[in-house]
Amino acid sequence: MASSTQGQVITCKAAVAWEANKPMTIEDVQVAPPQAGEVRVKILFTALCHTDHYTWSGKDPEGLFPCILGHEAAGIVESVGEGVTEVQPGDHVIPCYQAECRECKFCKSGKTNLCGKVRAATGVGVMMNDRKSRFSINGKPIYHFMGTSTFSQYTVVHDVSVAKINPQAPLDKVCLLGCGVSTGLGAVWNTAKVEAGSIVAIFGLGTVGLAVAEGAKSAGASRIIGIDIDSKKFDVAKNFGVTEFVNPKDHDKPIQQVIVDLTDGGVDYSFECIGNVSVMRSALECCHKGWGTSVIVGVAASGQEISTRPFQLVTGRVWKGTAFGGFKSRSQVPWLVEKYLNKEIKVDEYVTHSMNLTDINKAFDLLHEGGCLRCVLATDK
């Protein structure tokens, strides 16, 4: 059914980042109607992720200001542009920063979940059709972010970047499947393919690290070692499947040696969930000679490089990376939502705080406190 606002500019509230590292402000933003191949979504709930903060901090070379950040959200389709067939007004959806067009070289390869169709536009804060933004304030364009821009009551996304989900799913919970939880689960299931009986090490016990633990537990890992410099995280991590804990601050030896000693030669799989290149090296080097695999999940700052001795790889270790946990967004996010509804995966347990969009700056402060996993913001208050 067509909405009353179809084809019209909508004025709504959005959190605008005018410049790097300056508090966001709630503004009245004009959101243009969707063009061909685009979808306008009423965002109901959006969560905060460290990737949003990374761009807001000014360290992201692709960061453009002013912009509307946010990429972990859920909402309802308000209207669709010409040629859009897979979603319609009223559908419940999760915007996906990882597109899936099913037509490009990447999508057709069968080897990756990456998609090349809209990246050239989303990487510079615009839409594909006309290389312009759908957001403006008094005629001044406001850039998009990651093709999602969910810190707004309404957003416009490409149709290849939105997953239709079961309307029974609570949007204030399944919004987390738009990034962090899916990334951690998929790193285990899709990228590493952890087998039953494996020994796993997880560096960094934030939302993504805990989702890795959850995935490893469901895969039947025999030992799941959580590594973090904040010992307060350990009690929470037990609930997600972590079986033992190591705080690097408690040891004089390099952390990789501590883990090798604990595991009779090293772990079968390790996951770096921080984005620290020196920890990435530790994660690789704590893997067992001959077969250990380390997966880089955390996003390092631009320009940083990883290093290790080639001998580490020559002797059988494997170093891999993952984006969105290897999940194909439009095809598999709905499947993850069903797994949640069937109580096969945790999601609610990652939500430690609930606030309103107007409290977004306070929410970002919380993100850096040890007790916060995910803070979910309601946009309609």
Curated annotation (Swiss-Prot):
Entry protein name = Alcohol dehydrogenase class-3
Report keywords, A-Z.
Cytoplasm, Metal-binding, NAD, Oxidoreductase, Zinc
Its annotated compartments are:
Cytoplasm
**Documented EC number(s):** 1.1.1.1, 1.1.1.-, 1.1.1.284
| Free-text comment on the cofactor | Binds 2 Zn(2+) ions per subunit.
Q: Which residues bind Zn(2+) 2?
A: 101, 104, 107, 115
Which residues of this UniProt protein bind Zn(2+) 1? 49, 71-72, 179
Q: What class of enzyme is it?
A: oxidoreductase
- Names of required cofactors: Zn(2+)
Q: Which residues bind NAD(+) per the record?
A: 50, 204-209, 228, 233, 274, 297-299, 322-324, 374
